[in-house]
Structure formats: structure tokens, C-alpha cells
Amino acid sequence: AGMDTISYVLAMEEISKVDASVSVCMSVNNSLVCYGLQEYGTEEQKQKYLVPLAQGKKDGNLYIGAFMLSEPEAGSDATSQRTTAEDKGDHYLLNGTKNWITNGGSASVYLVMAQTDASKGSKGINCLIVEKDWPGVVVAAKENKMGIRGSDTHTVMFNDVKVPKANRIGEDGFGFKFAMKTLAGGRIGIASQALGIASGAYELALAYSK
């Protein structure tokens, strides 16, 4: 708390030297979820979600977040979202599937990008704060990855999940801009992780060569 980006980069590098799984979990929670809420969330959202996310715990239990943009047919092309959030007045009705979600099973809170008005293109996307234990949220089995296996990656499905309007981040239609701005910061975490992994591998190889 209270430290700058350089301090965060140094911490990410050191953790990545010994455990890339821990660092990628940390990167998503801090670079994407916490940063997004800190910069664009309301005071109510910050108090309810950001405080325990920054602490990593709530009521003595693990409390981290996940960022949900990728879908079966929408990866780099974020405007091709198929997940929908139908405006129902005081809440949204969320339906869709998100793939390759880091912290998908271990997270308690999700930042979910969803299309609320397809006719508006990128301006019809919103970001919603969704709690994992809400009715209609289904977490699929953990992906059997080749590496960074300590980091859980899942497909997550939403079936008529009621999301309060108070859980939308920013004004209506801000979701795409939110995702792009947040991901820009997230890339700092990924770059730091890559440097740390490379440094750790070098140190191990050097020690072995002797």
C-alpha cells in the first residue's frame, strides 16, 4: 500500500523468479482487478470490493479477483463479445461464457465485460462486478495446462445472473474503454513476470553450470 509502479514491478520480478503461478495470480488481482476498481470504481464499490481485494482476504478467507474478457469467439477482438447483460431497470441479467480465466476458481469477485447494446459496437459494452457465489454462476473444471499449473484457469458460465446496477463500473457504455485502459496497466505485470522468470532460469542455469 502506498508504493509506486516501480516497487510493484520489482516485487513481481522477485516473486516470478521462484513461482510464476503465484505471480500471475498476483498480477491479475493487482494489475487488472484492483487497479480497475481503484481508478474507475465508485466509493461504494471500493469499500465493498477493493479493500478486501487489496488485503487478499475477507473474514479470514482468501479473497482475490478475476478479469473476464476472453470468450470462445472473442479474444483479441474485444468488441466481438457474445456475453450479454440485458437491462432490467434496477439490474442487468447476465448470460454468456468466458474462457481462459486466470483465478477463475479461486477468485471471489469477477470483473465481467458484457454486451448491453450490440447496435452500439464498442460503446455498447459494460463492465460488471459479479460475485462468484451468486445464483447462475457456474465454474467449469480447471484447465489441464502445460505450465504455470499452480495458477487455476477456468471457463466460467453465467446463466441469468442478476447483477445490480450499482455494480456497473463507470457510465453506461464505458466497458470497452475500461478493458483497454486496465489491460494497458496489466501488461506491466506480465512484462515484470517475464523478466523474473528469465532471471530465475538464468540463476538456476548458472548455478548448475558450476
Where are these regions (language model features)?
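A short core secondary-structure module
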Residues: 91, 95-139
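A structural signal for short hydrophobic beta-strand segments in well-ordered beta-sheet cores
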Residues: 83-86
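Short Ser/Thr-interspersed hydrophobic loop/turn segments at strand-loop and sheet-helix junctions
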Residues: 12-16, 113-114, 130-135, 159-163
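A short, Trp-centered hydrophobic/proline-enriched beta-strand micro-motif
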Residues: 60-70
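Short beta-alpha junctions and helix-cap segments that line functional grooves
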Residues: 49, 81, 97-99, 140-144
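Internal helix-loop-helix
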Residues: 1-61, 102-109, 120-121, 188
